[in-house]
Amino acid sequence: TGTFRLADLVGMDTAVHVINGMRQNCPDDEQVAALEVPKFLTFLTDNKFYGNKSGQGFYKKTGEKDPKGRPVVLALNLETLEYTQSQKEKLPVLDTLKQIDELPRRIKAVFKADDKGAQLLQRSFLGLFAYVSNRVPEISDTLYAVDDALRAGFAWEAGPFQYWDMAGVAECVERAEKQGEKIGSWVKEMLQAGHTSFYKIENGIRKYYDLRSKSYQPLPGGASFILLDNYRSNKPVYTNAECTLHDIGDGVLCLEFHSKMNAIGEGILRGINDSIQIAEEQGWKGMVIGNNAQNFTVGANLMMIAMMAYQQEWDELNQAVNIFQQTSMRIRYSSIPVVIATQGYVFGGGCEFSMHADAVVAAAESYIGLVEVGVGIIPGGGGTKEFAVRLSDEITKEGDVQIPRLIDKFKSIATAQVATSAYEAFNFGYLLPQKDQVVHNTARNISEAKAKVLELADDYVMPIQRKDVYVLGRTGLGALYIAAHSLKLGHYASEHDIKIAKKVAYVLCGGDLTSPQTVSEQYLLDIEREMFLSLCGEQKTLERIQFMLENGKPLRN
């Protein structure tokens, strides 16, 4: 939330109290001493325009809508103190930053740009850097505690000293002083002693600059975390354009994705298969699949699927889907334990991989789901098959409890349910209590996954592919078709949604079988792939894929 929008949320009266309270309680703070209630804020409080709670503040809703159906919102002109039509400012730096995934590269790009948006960001960052340099050791003896507090308390991706490292400490000191900022003397002493950063990695150990000893010290508790940046200086066990295999110690490997948004393409599929083969042939104890990015993965590379579907390259698409399925099966049926560590988005193929792993260590803030229906297809990397397998393990061959459980599984896929936390993922069937676990500190998920690999490695026996999957055939299909049509009658689904839902139902029930019976996993994978390919030939599916690629949100057609 931006500064003025946040003020509307908090309330102008509260903002004034905060300013006055800070001036009273922090008299020696050079920034607080300069704080004054601006004219426009006095205007708002005098007129009791407190923000959201009074109906208007810096912004004012009119109740009207523009030609595109969006609410018309007026903004306060800070000079005239009148409300005018708010307009989005065109800032080239934002267009540049949207193209960059890695946070360090984004910060460097901010300081290289020269438009007014970049200048605002630069002034803000330099002011922040100067301020925190003067608060250490006043409020904390260690700089990492300041970073930790702002990351934990305000959900920042990095703390101010970490941002400063990304931008370049010496360069920012020079620019800040030109801007009129006063930098803490200890920072200059650090630079003069030849120490050019606040943090560094030495022999795989992350260290911070300690003011007391004027040297680098290991971060406390660092052994509890596995940060893959700490292994960058080591030669990788394996690498390609989309993933890298690291030796994280104790005979355990970690495969890290680094494609754009960690989307699963040919490189990641090949990397998973090659990495498992390396682990098996070279005698490693097991493998973690995980990364320290904001999101584990957004799922399959949709552009790759779209190109083959538009060009009607059905043999190539069939082969690509088959490779995806066999990669999921390779994760499950290898001679070493494979544990997946997740955080952030775990969509589509990422969810399918996790369902096939020996175990999942999910950060509490993992948003897990099979979202393929939103782009007009079904989960085709083994996810629909795996739901049929899990249903088989839950139900008995007798009793009416079968159909309600079947409908629950069906709804998870057909309505593209995304768990809003790792705990909710258990309710949707994406995680299983007997094998998966949740960690509250996202930074611990890879280290916990490594511990799980070591726990499983002793006496690990490669599973045998299932040929005893109990499916309901026509008995289940009838119930699911009724459930699908009830969604349409309730205006929750379109005709194309129903077509997709019926394909999901077909796989979950093992096809149009005359009676309930047992089938093999490969049988289910074959019909899953058949249903996936049939939907790729639908015009409405192609429209959904194109709309998602162009707009980043699903089309309901």
Regions found by a protein language model. Name each.
Residues 1-294, 303-323, 327-336, 343-347, ...:
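N-terminal glycine-rich phosphate-binding loop for ADP-containing cofactors
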Residues 352:
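Short alpha-helical segment that forms part of, or immediately flanks, the ligand-binding pocket
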Residues 298-300:
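Extended, composition-driven regions rather than compact fold-specific motifs
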